Amino acid sequence: MKTQHIVHLSTYPADDIRIFQKACKSEVAEGYRVTQIVCHNSDETVDGVEIRSMPRSKRRLSRMIVLPWRMFRAATQQDGDIYQFHHPDLMLAGLLLKLSGKKVIYDTREFYPDKILSMRWIPAKLRPIASSAFALYERITSAAWDHVIVADRYSAKAFKGRPVSVVPNYPLLTPVEPTTVGKHKKHTLIYVGGLSAERGLLVMLKIAELLRDHNVELQLMGNCPFPEDEERIHAVPNVQYLGNQDLQGVYQHLGEADLGLLLLQPVPAYTYAGENTLKLFEYMWCGLPVVSSDFPNLRQIIESAQCGICIDPRDAERAAAAILRLLEEPELRQKMGTNGRNAILSAYNWPAASRVLSQIYQNVLSGKRSAVEPLPLWSVEPVDAAPCSTRVVA
């Protein structure tokens, strides 16, 4: 009997956590043959996943036209049973595969119509037009896909009436030693993720400055795409920039910190943050209390788990005061950290999310165009995004 073959098309790094570490490895464990077509240096097989390399496209237009065509041609050589593409840039490849009679899944981890409204490379006046145009394009093309996968309930609303399922961005249960309160003399705040004003970088730097005389340091991990932002980071003495880290490095540093920061700004791309926010769940898994933006979906998770506090992410002074109060209460921090880790073990983990993914594949292979029931949250009803603001703290 032929082993069923899942082929992933991705513009993300070959070792991407959501695609490679979670989805691909889970599929291999279930007995599928798994191939990932990705921009990479060479063909290789890693942990049972066949990686087929493509040359990188440096220009944006090339990524939207040339790269999808190349990936389509490479994909047709794989004889896959399911083709799953992971970025809107590859929609052309997905459409060509559908025209070739293939089963195709569109897997999007972000809500791009909102994200476009914060893209700096698009002139500000054109962003609303670009956002609306993309939303229409995404909606029309979604009729072609055998299934759509999103990372949260908010994004799923855009595909109402389509076979859409939520596969949350829950963490792998990688062995990790939970944070021990009082392990170090210095208090460490930590952030993992992209570094930009919209993601709270400037507020975090201001908080570090305000707490400099309280034996507090801030550690930042992740990509900093703008040189001017990296200069700002290096200008604050009690801030340590650790750059990009692999999963082991991330967990090692999280295990040595005191508080995890998640101060996304109230711009359209982030106000719906919740079950799609991996860093939140990584903090919880490592036993870190969370200091989060007070957005409804984040509050829903954090308050139900009693694993942190939610604050106004634009007010650095009040945030610093709230953080200082937490640092002065080690027993409360220990309790919050334990609560967060227990919530991960009980509900918010990748083994649970992978069961949804497994059912999606079964549906697609059997020709069923129906959604898979989302995993339950700890509250009864999901909530809508918070009101958006164009103001980002400077």
Task: Walk through the language-model features, giving the residues of each.
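Conserved donor-binding/catalytic core segment of Leloir-type glycosyltransferases
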Residues: V7-L9, I149, P171, T180-A208, ...
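Membrane-proximal helix-turn-helix segments that form the acceptor-binding/catalytic region
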Residues: K25, P68-T76, L92, L96-S100, ...
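Glycosyltransferase donor-sugar binding loop
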Residues: N41-S42, V192, E217-E230
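Donor nucleotide-sugar binding/catalytic pocket of nucleotide-sugar-dependent glycosyltransferases
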Residues: R52, F134-P178
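Nucleotide-activated donor-binding/catalytic signature segment of Leloir-type glycosyltransferases, i.e.
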Residues: E228-L259
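A short, well-ordered alpha-helix in the C-terminal region of glycosyltransferases
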Residues: R318, R325, L332-A347, Q359
